[in-house]
Amino acid sequence: MSHSVKIYDTCIGCTHCVRACPTDVLEMIPWDGCKAKQIASAPRTEDCVGCKRCESACPTDFLSVRVYLGPETTRSMALSY
């Protein structure tokens, strides 16, 4: 799948998204831009299945982590309707 996972600087370093990901796409890395001194990172996007559990787990109302589904997923979702 070709999904894109973007982490934004509104991340508060809580690790909820990392713990919610069933395919271990996300990890925390050091970052001085927030109180927790860490930010989510997505080094393994090729393993993303597009479930968006990371988005649902994010306490910043989906403003910090976003999953953009690839074209093949969008097409298959349209066929299921």
UniProtKB/Swiss-Prot annotation:
Residues that hold [4Fe-4S] cluster 2 according to the record: 21, 48, 51, 54
Protein name: Photosystem I iron-sulfur center
Membrane topology according to the record: Peripheral membrane protein
Lineage, highest ranks first: Eukaryota, Viridiplantae, Streptophyta, Embryophyta, Tracheophyta
Enzyme Commission number(s) of this protein: 1.97.1.12
Gene name for this UniProt entry: psaC
Molecular function terms, GO-annotated: 4 iron, 4 sulfur cluster binding; electron transfer activity; metal ion binding; oxidoreductase activity
Subcellular location: Plastid, Chloroplast thylakoid membrane
InterPro entries for this protein: 4Fe4S_Fe-S-bd, 4Fe4S_Fe_S_CS, PSI_iron-sulfur_center, PSI_PsaC
Free-text cofactor note: Binds 2 [4Fe-4S] clusters. Cluster 2 is most probably the spectroscopically characterized electron acceptor FA and cluster 1 is most probably FB.
Record-annotated 4Fe-4S ferredoxin-type domain positions: 2-31, 39-68
Cofactor: [4Fe-4S] cluster
Keyword Ribonucleoprotein: no
One record GO biological process: photosynthesis
